[in-house]
Structure formats: structure tokens, C-alpha cells
Amino acid sequence: MHIRLATESDVPAILSLIHALAVYEREPDAVQLGEAELRRDGFGTQPLFECLIADDEGEAAGFALYFPIYSTWRGPSIHLADLFVQPSHRSRGIGKALLERVAAIAMERGCGRLQWDVLDWNTPAIDFYRSRGAVMLESWRIMRVTGAALARLAKSSSPGT
């Protein structure tokens, strides 16, 4: 098994892993993008994300999808959107290797922070992250606007402001 940067040819495997993660996270119908969007957003002229693949003899055993963000407190940072290992490949250090590689990339890029979200019921993941030095920010909550609410909010904007 080795960790490598994903290429455009990995898009079908990445999408499959995203769907598997959605099932694990109890939201099997939440994924609304397809291969075309992943190709455009990750492998186009201005990539919005990067992805690592845990390659086990040609099989995508897991992945880590991340992107740059900016912290007004810490400067350049990375947000880890997804970290997932196929159930058949767990307990072999793959998740640890993926997380460590993303952390190394953050350090190489001079980032002051690596952050991600975790579901409150996902105690195996919480324990895994805590065992690697992560701290749960109990007082922070995620706010999100999607779909019609996003369109309404955008429509409220005055031109030129």
C-alpha cells in the first residue's frame, strides 16, 4: 500500500469512495455531484481541491480530500473535507498514513492549522483523531446555507456592495 496524489484517472474511484463515505455517514442520498464536477473542480485549470489515494495493489483502499483555506488567526491552513478507508482495508494504518500525509503537506506549505469536521456520533473517528493530537472544539458549531436558502441569501445582495 502506498499513498499518492490522485490523478484525473482516479475520478471514478474517488466518486465511489465519496458514495461509500456518505453511506457510512448515514446520508446515502446526499452526494449531488458526479465525475464531471470532480474532474472540473479537482483536475481543471484552477483546482479547488487535492486528493490523496491509498493505493493497495491498484485498488483505491481509501482517500483524503482537502483544500486550502485561510485563518485570520493562523494564516494559511488546510481543511480536510473527507478521510475514508474502505471497511475491508481498515485496521492496517491506512487512515493514519493518509492523515499524516495531509499534515505533512500542511507543514510543507507553511500552514498554521489543519482542521476537519466529524459527526458527533462517530466515536471511532473522534477517538482516532484525538489519539493523533486533535482537539474537539466543543463551543463551535458549523453553519451552512444550501439550495433555495443560498439562492435567497445571494438574491438579497445589492449590486456593487
Task: Report residues per predicted region.
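Conserved active-site tyrosine of GNAT-family acetyltransferases
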Residues: 66, 129-130
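Conserved N-terminal entry element of GNAT/NAT acetyltransferase domains
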Residues: 1-9, 150-161
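Conserved beta-strand-loop-alpha-helix junction that forms the acyl-donor binding cleft
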Residues: 116-125, 144-148
